[in-house]
């Protein structure tokens, strides 16, 4: 294999894994540790929580949540980022990283809070998934979004660029 072919192949793979993912979810944007820690302090993340990160990237949110005592589960569709995240989190028993599309996954029963990088185009999808999960699990679920506030529902709390939404389970129609 020629060196130029190898370079082109690497760039094509990187484009596929990083570029095309944007059409399915948010782009990979690394989170700043100090901002995440301040947000977790503000919103009171702790050892009774299970945080699910939709689009967990390199796993920094998961590892910080674990330091707060929370169990953390990350869904990521980019296999390169899953590998990096698993490597960086390998010694942390409270961190789980799944190579899976979060849009098609069922949130675990233990979920208390979902973390997402907010992209306005995904608002209705996120709201629908969280409401369905709250109904299925029959408990309130929190959604902590970094970035743009939602346009169609109000945040229960806001801290800097973080917006907290709470989804209450709706009563079944036959109840």
Regions found by a protein language model. Give the residues of each.
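Conserved SAM-binding motif I beta-strand of class I
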Residues: 71-76
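Conserved SAM-binding loop of SAM-dependent methyltransferases across substrates and taxa
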Residues: 58-70
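Conserved class I S-adenosyl-L-methionine
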Residues: 47-57
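Conserved SAM-binding loop
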Residues: 85-86
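S-adenosyl-L-methionine
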Residues: 1-46
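Conserved SAM-binding strand-loop segment of SAM-dependent methyltransferases
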Residues: 92-102
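Conserved beta-strand signature within the Rossmann-like core of class I S-adenosyl-L-methionine
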Residues: 138-149
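A short, conserved alpha-helix within the catalytic core of class I
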Residues: 121-134
């Amino acid at each position: 294999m020629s060196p130029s072919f190898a370079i082109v192949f690497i760039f094509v793979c990187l484009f596929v894994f990083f570029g095309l993912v944007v059409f399915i979810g948010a782009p990979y944007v690394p989170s700043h540790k100090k901002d995440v820690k301040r947000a977790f302090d503000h919103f009171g993340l702790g050892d009774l929580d299970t945080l699910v990160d939709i689009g967990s990237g390199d796993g920094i949110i998961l590892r910080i949540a674990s330091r707060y005592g929370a169990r953390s589960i990350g869904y990521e569709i980019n296999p390169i980022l899953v590998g990096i995240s698993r490597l960086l989190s390998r010694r942390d028993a409270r961190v789980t990283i799944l190579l899976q599309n979060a849009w098609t996954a069922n949130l675990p029963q233990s979920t208390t809070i979902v973390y997402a990088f907010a992209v306005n185009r995904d608002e209705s999808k996120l709201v629908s998934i969280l409401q369905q999960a709250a109904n299925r699990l029959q408990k309130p679920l929190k959604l902590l979004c970094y970035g743009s506030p939602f346009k169609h529902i109000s945040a229960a709390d806001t801290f800097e660029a973080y917006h907290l939404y709470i989804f209450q389970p709706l009563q079944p129609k036959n109840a």
